[in-house]
Regions:
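Short, amphipathic alpha-helical "lid/cap" segments that border enzyme active or binding sites
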Residues: 21, 25-28, 144, 277-287
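Alpha-helix C-cap/termination motif
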Residues: 34, 65-69, 94, 124, ...
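Active-site beta->alpha loop and helix N-cap motifs at the rims of alpha/beta catalytic domains
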Residues: 2-141
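Catalytic alpha/beta core domains of metabolic enzymes, predominantly
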Residues: 124, 137-238, 245
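C-terminal alpha-helical cap/extension of soluble enzyme domains
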Residues: 4-12, 34-35, 90, 198-200, ...
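Glycine-rich phosphate-binding "P-loop"
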Residues: 133, 155, 269-270
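A general structural signal for well-ordered alpha-helical segments in protein cores
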Residues: 24, 55, 59, 84, ...
Length: 293
């Protein structure tokens, strides 16, 4: 099976914090040209700062720009099942390839509550649903046994694991081996190649916003059986990640590194961190080191 890379696409903003849809379309074109698929309205896309209407329009714009040249997954997850369901139904009508559902945040959920939440959404739409686990941000974790139970649902197609723990990723991969049709997509940038070698269907990476060619290079080399080249590209990716993420919150650093390559990306909506000249100077040094400027 050909493995696939998705970029967790940034959302571009104007100076007045309205969405810059044309700049976002430009980022879509850049990623598709590199050979990557798109995930929009996720963690790297400032989804918590977007309104319902903005998420719907953003998805329409992305799908229109992609025009069938790549796959599009969009995140519908919100704290309440009700709002998640409304978004999922809207995305279902637009015609995306998959709907990711991040675990509810702020609200503490039991595993039974998570099963009910995801199943309710999956029952309501025809588009395949992908579970999205990122416990460091949501404080709710999809246990591997819960993933196994949900994998039996006919419209739950897989999981994006952004937990960062290799042990959990291994457990999800075991579920995929036992449940045909259930796919695992790795989120941690340093585990892209490892996850591919151990049965993942692909990855969904935020760092690919800054290094689209390197991300695509890992996947293309792996799919071609050139493991040495895949390892070389993964080493670049992992080193860039280490250098960049040492400066601050990962999605913010990705967005800022992209802004310093292309200012049309804009800053994130407040209360995101304001630009810091000293930090920018350090990011520029990293970008130059990796020949991005």
């Amino acid at each position: 099976m050909t493995k696939q890379a998705f970029v967790a696409l940034v959302t571009c903003f104007n100076e007045d914090e309205t969405i810059n849809y044309e700049a976002t379309r430009a980022q879509v074109r850049r990623q598709v040209a590199a050979g990557n698929n798109i995930m929009c309205a996720g963690t790297n896309g400032d989804f918590t700062a977007l309104t319902h209407e903005e998420k719907v329009r953003l998805t329409e714009e992305v799908v229109d720009e992609v025009a069938g040249r790549a796959r599009v997954i969009v995140n519908a997850g919100m704290p309440a099942t009700y709002e998640t369901l409304q978004l999922a139904e809207a995305f279902d009508r637009i015609g995306v390839d998959g709907i990711a559902v991040i675990t509810p945040f702020f609200i503490a959920c039991t595993q039974d509550g998570l099963i009910r939440h995801f199943s309710t959404v999956a029952d309501a739409v025809e588009t395949p649903i992908y579970l999205y686990d990122i416990p460091a941000r949501t404080q709710n974790h999809i246990e591997p046994e819960t993933a196994r139970k949900l994998a039996a649902h006919g419209n739950i197609a897989g999981i994006k694991d952004s937990g960062g723990a290799q042990q959990t990723l291994e457990a999800y991969l075991q579920v995929a081996k036992e449940m045909p049709g259930f796919e695992v997509y790795s989120g941690p940038d340093h585990l892209v190649l490892w996850s591919l070698q151990n049965g993942a269907a692909g990855c969904i990476s935020g760092l690919g916003n800054a290094l689209p060619d390197v991300l695509a290079g890992i996947l293309s080399a792996f799919n071609a059986g050139d493991i040495a080249e895949a390892e070389r590209q993964q080493a670049i990716y992992a080193d860039f990640r280490t250098d960049l993420y040492a400066l601050g919150f990962a999605p913010a650093m990705v967005k800022r590194s992209l802004y310093l390559q292309d200012s049309s990306v804009g800053a994130s909506r407040q209360p995101a961190l304001l630009p810091d000249k000293e930090q920018d100077d350090r990011i520029v040094e990293i970008l130059r080191l990796y020949r991005r400027l």
